[in-house]
Amino acid sequence: MSNEYPYASMRDSFDLSAYFVVGPEDCKGRPLTDVVDQALHGGATFIQLRAKEADASELTDMARDIAQIIEDNEKSDSVAFVIDDRADVVWQARRKGIKVDGVHIGQTDMEPREARALLGDEAIVGLSAETESLVRLINELPDGCIDYIGAGPLHVSTTKPEASVGGNDGSGKTLDAAQINTICVASEFPVVVGGGVTAADMAMLADTKAAGWFVVSAIAGAENPEEAARTMVEGWKAVRGDKKHGYAPRVVTHTPATDTQAAQEGAAKPGSEATEKKFTNAKDAKDAQKLAKQQRVDIAARGSKQRDKAHIRKTKSVPFTYQYGSYDLEVPYTEIKLSDTPGVGPNPPFHDYNTEGPKCDPKEGLKPLRLDWIRDRGDIEDYEGRRRNLEDDGKRAIKRGRATKEWRGRKHEPMRAKDHPITQMWYARHGIITPEMQYVATRENCDVELVRSELAAGRAVMPCNINHPEAEPMIIGSAFLTKLNANMGNSAVTSSIDEEVEKLTWATKWGADTVMDLSTGNDIHTTREWILRNSPVPIGTVPMYQALEKVEDDASKLSWELFRDTVIEQCEQGVDYMTIHAGVLLRYVPLTANRVTGIVSRGGSIMADWCLRHHQESFLYTHFDELCDIFAKYDVAFSLGDGLRPGSLADANDAAQLSELMTLGELTERAWAKDVQVMIEGPGHVPFDTVRMNIELEKAVCHNAPFYTLGPLTTDTAPGYDHITSAIGATEIGRYGTAMLCYVTPKEHLGLPNKDDVKQGVIAYKIACHAADIAKHHPHAMDRDNAISKARFEFRWLDQFNLSYDPDTAIAFHDDTLPAEPAKMAHFCSMCGPKFCSMAISQNIRKAFGGEAAQQQIVKEAAAGIDSEALATAKANVDNGVVSANVLSPEEILAGMDAMSEKYTAQGGKLYSTAQE
């Protein structure tokens, strides 16, 4: 089993000058991580976790949290982190990828040589020693065995944790400056001194030969740990300055950490080449070579190097003025530069819709693009809002005392409407064209009046919560480009905040127009905060998931009051649209009893369970008007959930699905009456021949509100390929007017998608959206197709790669067989080779017969029966064995087909079979 520890060793860079020892029992009831965080802000340079009563699992969890705090403070490369006594826990944590730099052991703990053998040569090992004689014995240890010594106590203390770094001999003896210097001179290792240390000791300690001081209570027990740490650090530096101690010699005398040696056998030593595996037969060697080649292709296809080089985000400045202000709107687009056509001239760059957003530091978040637009209208107010509490992040956060990775970037006070709804629908209905509408019109290449009128009629929605000013306005409606949503979010089983932010960035890079955070696991509130502050696209949620987490997954404990509080919490954070399963009514639940797959919607099943347990109507339905009033204050759009959607083809279009749809039509009108934007969620599994019926039924029942569908999947037989089965249905339903398609990844029905699954799902659905736009005859929909076709015909290979939705996969597949750079200028690919390339042959035909005048002359002569020079050449080619064919007219083709059909029928054949047959 290989060592998974990914971090560089700190054995040559740790700083003992401000060494903070801490455990949960030292923090006076405050969260351990909060105290560590404050100590780091105050200048602590070394952290030791000491929790004598904790078991290995608890210590590992604490270590993970402390390592995350150090990372959040951007000090992972400057502040070392060790665990007291438990080398076994350090070993386990490092194998889990947690940044624990080493262990500190006492005289009664693990023998130093054993600790070094267990942890390997990269870990820090510290050792306690209280006397000069003990230090001299430690010097006899093999070179490279330990890295520093902890000596103490400086003062008599009744609390054992402060007696010394690693433990006390119980003698009660203390150290003075002379004794400290004696120990330091005797030691071959840097020495850190502590035990009852306070700020008053700093000048004396800094004047000795000690490398630094260690402390527990003076910081952990202080009213303000940050200020206490800062005072001590400044006192030390006033005498010592920034001068650092030296390091023990690094002599590698041990093997790597236990259990890694076997995994590293045969691996290359530093500075040497890896030894290739030898094979006993040619077949094994060829198979290994093929596998290695395929792995290289797969790795290249999973990246974005070529895409990032070719797809450049730019902005177009659009002046905008209305009664509330004047602005220069910087509207984004993607520019793809194209090469020249050989012998003809330059090709203009291709401009495409951009969803990626500007680059930013994820820890700081995006700039609030729309904040001035929102404030200048004068119809909102700032207010304090509800206070976030640990319950918002779930039961594990309550136990831990904090989220695993707190948001420390830009903070904002929540805003809400003052006197009237502040939705884009309200403005549109009052004839006000907002900056958001002009921004969208520029992105869509359409007239702004089309945007306003579609919003006013409810045929389009613009999800843009005033508390998410970072989002770039976009529109969802059948009159506009078909949009794509990507789902993500953690679960109770897997993922982290960093992974979810990375998935967000990855999804928008490849073209996601909106993202839904469907987190159901750890840190729901904080994960959402990170996502919102970093998202250039609207964010949707299902608030029921967080509400259920707050009642520890017991649906019977849900209430309207708890749900309302959760909705307001998310409105204040900036969620742009919310899935509300208000159409799952008590009387509809029995209709699902005989389904093959029952109720597959998580939100729908939660509400069905609540209705049955209480035998009451859904509080989402009975309090729907109150939800409308809340949404109108923040401009949050409804995504009316299809809680009774079919989860298999066998259940499609049944009474439960259609009954819920009728209720969603009623709720749409109720929301519109309060100027709240609405879109309707659609079915997930539908036979292909009923896809069109579903969209047409939704339009009729829900008054042309935008339809938002998951796929639909058109077969249930392809786990692992449901991004394909669903993209087929998505293209068809998009063709007939579905406004937004929710992607499906290869992991659908199988597990939580990772980064590569997200890319696969987004690309599949970008293709579906684009195909639907072409089928709808959307203006300019075929521009990209025409550009790439022209590049293909002209053998401009790089332009072909760059104009594709996934340049990295395209170039990886091409280079799989033709990797040489000259092949990217060749007039063939590996499919046909240089002699049989249809494009090359077609170019020769164009050279011979191209030009409008030549074409007209050929047609004229052929119609007149004249054997032109061109026709004579064609006949000569046939005579010489060159494959050719006479071109039949449409009439001749039809006549020939009829004749063949008659012959087939006369022989007893049947052209078509009935369903019974």
UniProtKB/Swiss-Prot annotation:
Report whether Manganese shows up as a keyword of the record.
Answer: no
- Per UniProt, [4Fe-4S] cluster binds at C829, C832, C837
Per UniProt, 5-amino-1-(5-phospho-beta-D-ribosyl)imidazole binds at N487, M516, Y545, H581, S601, R602, G603, D642, G643, L644, R645, E681, Y708
Catalyses which reaction(s): 2-[(2R,5Z)-2-carboxy-4-methylthiazol-5(2H)-ylidene]ethyl phosphate + 4-amino-2-methyl-5-(diphosphooxymethyl)pyrimidine + 2 H(+) = thiamine phosphate + CO2 + diphosphate; 2-(2-carboxy-4-methylthiazol-5-yl)ethyl phosphate + 4-amino-2-methyl-5-(diphosphooxymethyl)pyrimidine + 2 H(+) = thiamine phosphate + CO2 + diphosphate; 4-methyl-5-(2-phosphooxyethyl)-thiazole + 4-amino-2-methyl-5-(diphosphooxymethyl)pyrimidine + H(+) = thiamine phosphate + diphosphate; 5-amino-1-(5-phospho-beta-D-ribosyl)imidazole + S-adenosyl-L-methionine = 4-amino-2-methyl-5-(phosphooxymethyl)pyrimidine + CO + 5'-deoxyadenosine + formate + L-methionine + 3 H(+)
Q: What is this protein called?
A: Thiamine biosynthesis bifunctional protein ThiEC
**Which cofactor names does the annotation list?**
[4Fe-4S] cluster
Give the family from UniProt.
In the N-terminal section; belongs to the thiamine-phosphate synthase family.
Q: Where does Mg(2+) bind?
A: D85, D109
Per UniProt, the keywords (alphabetical) are: 4Fe-4S, Iron, Iron-sulfur, Lyase, Magnesium, Metal-binding, Multifunctional enzyme, S-adenosyl-L-methionine, Thiamine biosynthesis, Transferase, Zinc
Region feature (Phosphomethylpyrimidine synthase): 271-917
What does the cofactor section's free text say about binding? Binds 1 [4Fe-4S] cluster per subunit. The cluster is coordinated with 3 cysteines and an exchangeable S-adenosyl-L-methionine.
Question: Which biological process terms from the Gene Ontology are attached to this UniProt entry?
Answer: thiamine biosynthetic process; thiamine diphosphate biosynthetic process
Which GO terms label this protein's molecular function in UniProt? 4 iron, 4 sulfur cluster binding; carbon-carbon lyase activity; magnesium ion binding; thiamine-phosphate diphosphorylase activity; zinc ion binding
Show the GO cellular component annotation of the record: cytosol
Species this chain originates from: Bifidobacterium longum (strain NCC 2705)
Known EC number(s)? 2.5.1.3, 4.1.99.17
InterPro entries xrefs: Aldolase_TIM, ThiamineP_synth_sf, ThiamineP_synth_TenI, ThiC, ThiC/Bza_core_dom, ThiC/BzaA/B, TMP_synthase
Spans annotated as Thiamine-phosphate synthase:
1-243
